[in-house]
Amino acid sequence: MAALVQRIRARAASLPTFDIPFLLILLLLLSYGLIMLFSAGYAVALYRRGDAYTYIRPQLLFAALGVLAMYAASLVDYHVWHRLAWPMLGISLLLLTIVLFMPEYNGCKRWIVLPGLGTLQPSEIAKFSIVLVFSHIISLNHDRMKSFSTGVVPFALILGVVTVLMLLEPHLSGTLLILSIGAVLMFVGGTGLQWFGLAGGLGAAAIAAAVIALPELVPYATDRLASWRDPFADPLGEGHQTIQSLYAIASGGLAGLGLGNSRQKYLYVPEPQNDFIFSILCEELGFIGAALVVALFLLLLLRGMSIAVRARDKFGALLVVGFVVQVTLQAILNMAVVTNTIPNTGISLPFFSSGGTSLLMLLGEMGIVLSVSRQTDMA
């Protein structure tokens, strides 16, 4: 008996040690998101498909697959991604090109239809590949990041190609998110601050040019900008989604109407299971429920940064920073859209919004973070 206990203890000691606080925060976010997805989406699912489980059923499947992918990724030495960085970028560029030949949905070409399997969103894979390849380049050239040729040119070329392909979809929010992730990694990686000033000037010029050309390049974007400035100017058209979202948030008050008791999800808020799920959460769970979501994302960021600081090399640290910043920035952008702080850009809330590709990629990325945490100096 004593020998059996000793073998069990030895086996337990040999198992990989994850960052438990990070894992717990992640599982809380995932569970919270699944509960809210069913609550927010069952009414529209019943109306559209005659099945209240239309959205939650595949999401549960992808959540299970994602957890398995996360566990598998956590067991793999994260240095393997050095070799896979460029192939992943190549795959992303190929998929971003293929999607341009797909049928339009709501005026955009963002999804590749996989017969019998659903849809694939290439921008999700692009975000993943940007973190990989930027971390790879920076970790190999960290002592030369101050120079323009090393610290700016390769990143600008990669971002340029990716963002042009995404703007052709068009996917403005995804483009903004990828540019932000790239900028954060370059800053953390040591790119000279003077180049950020130059990039800021060029970016301002590009934004000015885009605003001038916007009606021709992206016709629907001008309507969204107008509805952002005054959604009540067109309450039954472009402003409808924003107005109904604000009604939902205001109805929630401090403690909300109760889980499942939203009124706005009954075909008032368009896409309550997707981009605007946060407004339904605010209505049902109030300020307290919304504050809990914000706190969980903030804790995920802080714990991720703690892992990055303790990482054994620059590559691991950059991977963690890239992935947790991606999740946090995406959550911030989604909440900003839902509250009409910024124009509606069509961006999902990580771990909450319906979307199998997104959830699978997110959990896989979190598995890489856990892999880095296994090899920290204090693991």
Language model features with spans:
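Transmembrane alpha-helix boundary/anchor motif
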Residues: 68, 76, 133, 208, ...
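Alpha-helical transmembrane segments of multi-pass membrane proteins, especially transporters
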Residues: 124, 132, 150-155, 178, ...
